[in-house]
């Protein structure tokens, strides 16, 4: 069953540093190993990132791998985080 993470920032989000994170972490044009989908975008009060993973282990591995780089780039922690096993994941 797929696993979803939802990260929400309620303040200004440093998209320039987020793009640098993706460039330094690997191929920005491809999804990381185990990631099935990613949606990133600004909202009126900050930003949202939603990712769908093959498993919670894939999501954790990605998070653990990139935590030092996130700290180095001083990307603030999200205001809210939700993580859950999906009951339905469909794509076209």
Language model features with spans:
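Short S/T/G/P-rich N-terminal loop/turn motif that feeds into the first structured element of a domain
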Residues: 1-50, 54-69, 75-92
